[in-house]
Amino acid sequence: MKQEFIDLAKYRLKKARNTLSDAKKYINNATLESTVNRIYYAMFYAVNALLITKGLSSSKHSGVRAFFNKEFVNKGLVEEKLGEFYSDMFKRRQKGDYQDFVKFERQDVTEWLKKGEEFINRIERLTLKIIEEQK
Protein backbone atom coordinates (compact mmCIF):
# COMPACT_ATOMS: atom_id res chain seq x y z
CA MET A 1 0.00 0.00 0.00
CA LYS A 2 1.31 3.43 -0.89
CA GLN A 3 2.39 5.63 2.00
CA GLU A 4 -0.14 8.32 1.06
CA PHE A 5 -2.98 5.80 1.57
CA ILE A 6 -1.50 4.61 4.85
CA ASP A 7 -1.32 8.23 6.00
CA LEU A 8 -4.90 8.87 4.90
CA ALA A 9 -6.20 5.76 6.67
CA LYS A 10 -4.40 6.74 9.88
CA TYR A 11 -5.71 10.30 9.58
CA ARG A 12 -9.26 9.01 9.31
CA LEU A 13 -8.74 6.76 12.33
CA LYS A 14 -7.57 9.81 14.26
CA LYS A 15 -10.60 11.73 13.04
CA ALA A 16 -12.80 8.86 14.24
CA ARG A 17 -11.17 9.03 17.69
CA ASN A 18 -11.55 12.82 17.87
CA THR A 19 -15.20 12.61 16.85
CA LEU A 20 -15.82 9.87 19.41
CA SER A 21 -14.25 12.15 22.02
CA ASP A 22 -16.70 14.86 20.97
CA ALA A 23 -19.59 12.40 21.40
CA LYS A 24 -18.43 11.64 24.94
CA LYS A 25 -18.52 15.36 25.75
CA TYR A 26 -21.85 15.86 23.97
CA ILE A 27 -23.69 13.19 25.96
CA ASN A 28 -23.79 15.52 28.98
CA ASN A 29 -23.40 18.93 27.34
CA ALA A 30 -25.42 18.89 24.12
CA THR A 31 -28.58 17.40 22.68
CA LEU A 32 -28.89 13.65 22.39
CA GLU A 33 -29.52 14.11 18.67
CA SER A 34 -26.10 15.78 18.35
CA THR A 35 -24.52 12.97 20.34
CA VAL A 36 -26.04 10.37 18.00
CA ASN A 37 -24.69 12.36 15.05
CA ARG A 38 -21.16 12.32 16.50
CA ILE A 39 -21.32 8.60 17.33
CA TYR A 40 -22.33 7.77 13.78
CA TYR A 41 -19.72 10.02 12.19
CA ALA A 42 -16.97 8.58 14.40
CA MET A 43 -17.93 5.14 13.11
CA PHE A 44 -18.19 6.45 9.54
CA TYR A 45 -14.63 7.85 9.64
CA ALA A 46 -13.32 4.54 11.01
CA VAL A 47 -15.06 2.57 8.26
CA ASN A 48 -13.64 4.96 5.67
CA ALA A 49 -10.15 4.24 7.02
CA LEU A 50 -10.81 0.52 6.67
CA LEU A 51 -12.08 0.91 3.10
CA ILE A 52 -8.86 2.69 2.13
CA THR A 53 -6.95 -0.51 2.90
CA LYS A 54 -8.83 -2.13 0.01
CA GLY A 55 -8.51 0.89 -2.30
CA LEU A 56 -12.20 1.71 -1.87
CA SER A 57 -14.07 4.93 -1.24
CA SER A 58 -17.49 6.42 -1.84
CA SER A 59 -18.88 9.93 -1.69
CA LYS A 60 -22.20 8.55 -0.41
CA HIS A 61 -22.98 7.05 2.97
CA SER A 62 -24.92 4.25 1.27
CA GLY A 63 -21.85 3.42 -0.82
CA VAL A 64 -19.62 3.28 2.25
CA ARG A 65 -22.09 0.93 3.97
CA ALA A 66 -22.37 -1.23 0.86
CA PHE A 67 -18.58 -1.58 0.47
CA PHE A 68 -18.18 -2.25 4.19
CA ASN A 69 -20.78 -5.01 4.13
CA LYS A 70 -19.56 -6.55 0.87
CA GLU A 71 -15.82 -6.50 1.58
CA PHE A 72 -15.68 -6.99 5.34
CA VAL A 73 -18.94 -8.20 6.90
CA ASN A 74 -20.02 -10.65 4.21
CA LYS A 75 -16.47 -12.07 4.02
CA GLY A 76 -16.38 -12.66 7.78
CA LEU A 77 -13.64 -10.12 8.53
CA VAL A 78 -16.04 -8.07 10.66
CA GLU A 79 -18.79 -9.57 12.78
CA GLU A 80 -22.30 -9.31 11.35
CA LYS A 81 -23.61 -7.69 14.53
CA LEU A 82 -21.15 -4.82 13.98
CA GLY A 83 -22.37 -4.37 10.43
CA GLU A 84 -25.95 -4.25 11.69
CA PHE A 85 -25.04 -1.76 14.42
CA TYR A 86 -23.34 0.51 11.86
CA SER A 87 -26.48 0.46 9.69
CA ASP A 88 -28.67 1.10 12.74
CA MET A 89 -26.56 4.10 13.74
CA PHE A 90 -26.86 5.49 10.21
CA LYS A 91 -30.67 5.27 10.48
CA ARG A 92 -30.64 6.86 13.93
CA ARG A 93 -28.42 9.69 12.71
CA GLN A 94 -30.73 10.27 9.75
CA LYS A 95 -33.73 10.33 12.07
CA GLY A 96 -32.09 12.72 14.53
CA ASP A 97 -30.78 15.06 11.84
CA TYR A 98 -33.76 15.20 9.50
CA GLN A 99 -36.99 14.21 11.25
CA ASP A 100 -39.06 16.46 13.46
CA PHE A 101 -40.01 15.73 17.06
CA VAL A 102 -37.39 13.02 17.50
CA LYS A 103 -36.64 12.04 21.08
CA PHE A 104 -33.81 9.71 21.97
CA GLU A 105 -33.53 8.27 25.47
CA ARG A 106 -30.33 9.03 27.38
CA GLN A 107 -29.96 5.38 28.43
CA ASP A 108 -30.11 4.27 24.78
CA VAL A 109 -27.65 6.90 23.59
CA THR A 110 -25.26 6.01 26.42
CA GLU A 111 -25.38 2.36 25.30
CA TRP A 112 -24.85 3.36 21.65
CA LEU A 113 -21.84 5.43 22.68
CA LYS A 114 -20.33 2.41 24.43
CA LYS A 115 -21.03 0.15 21.44
CA GLY A 116 -19.72 2.84 19.08
CA GLU A 117 -16.42 2.89 20.94
CA GLU A 118 -16.20 -0.91 20.76
CA PHE A 119 -16.97 -0.72 17.03
CA ILE A 120 -14.22 1.84 16.46
CA ASN A 121 -11.74 -0.20 18.51
CA ARG A 122 -12.48 -3.26 16.36
CA ILE A 123 -12.29 -1.38 13.06
CA GLU A 124 -9.08 0.37 14.11
CA ARG A 125 -7.40 -2.93 15.03
CA LEU A 126 -8.41 -4.47 11.71
CA THR A 127 -7.31 -1.42 9.71
CA LEU A 128 -3.89 -1.31 11.36
CA LYS A 129 -3.48 -5.08 10.93
CA ILE A 130 -4.20 -4.84 7.20
CA ILE A 131 -1.83 -1.90 6.83
CA GLU A 132 0.91 -3.85 8.60
CA GLU A 133 0.32 -6.92 6.43
CA GLN A 134 0.55 -4.84 3.25
CA LYS A 135 3.86 -3.17 4.08
Model-identified regions with their sequence ranges:
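Terminal alpha-helical segments
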Residues: 1-135
